[in-house]
Amino acid sequence: MSFAEELRARAARTPRRVVLAEGGDPRVAEAARRLADEKIAIPIVVGGAGIDPAKDPRLSRVATLLRERRPDRVRDGIEALDLATDPVRFAAGLVALGEADAAVAGATHTTAHVIRAALWAIGTAPGHDTLSSAFYMALPDGRVLTFTDCAVVADPTPEQLARIALAAAEDRCRLVGDAPRVAFLSYSTRGSAGGPSVDKVRVATEAFRTLAPEILADGELQGDAALAAAVAERKAPGSPVGGQANVLVFPDLDAGNIAYKLVQYLAGASAAGPLFQGLLRPMSDLSRGASVDDIITVTAMVAAQATAAGS
């Protein structure tokens, strides 16, 4: 069974209410049909043949929520109602109000728009002041690696990088079920090179150890030292994760985004995500090039997040 199939099977054991915010897109409509038919989730479709936010009785509650959360951005109730009719904001509002367990958007909206809606309506979880993302890379050899951050935070500070790593490690426990082994990646391994980026990764590693001393982690490590045991023995002897890392933390968005696409297209890996991390309640993004299967997989991922959080 593939990783995507495992996710779907797990979600089907406890189907969750997931808002699909772009029901007017044929891919989303087909994904909703299959999610319902296969009992993977209970889809709540916004747009298309689904809910029209402007006519939904919950619109005023979503508008009030948006106004209360961002009084500096909303001048009055009329503007709040107008903002709440946006399908992505409306979807996020339903999750924040407990009318749904999770939401998925991004098939026709930009990542930036989905992020703004999620932060505005839902907000970040306690201990996580940074929204970030991860891809779950299912390799042909059967391994599943977590790549973070590949879609959201362009140039994280050391503290942000540590919290991004913590969010990824926590979600890996929920989605994959194994013990996270976190590698903070760099072009240097244990002082083999220097520079501002290397310094950032070292500081982030120490910050992570303070945040989560119970989780195995090391850095700075080059990719080969993180993934190949023979290389780790030479470059990082005694590393608690050398050669066996399963959570790869990239120093910036350039590195993370480039890496996941290279592994996807050159190594034949299946990329599940991007999955948002650090939110109070689950909501996630889609690539605008997402297939129906991609939408179903991301829906299963946010459903698993919701189940693990008990929402």
Predicted regions and their residues:
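Anion-binding alpha/beta catalytic cores of soluble intermediary-metabolism enzymes, centered on
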Residues: 1-45, 52-242, 247-311
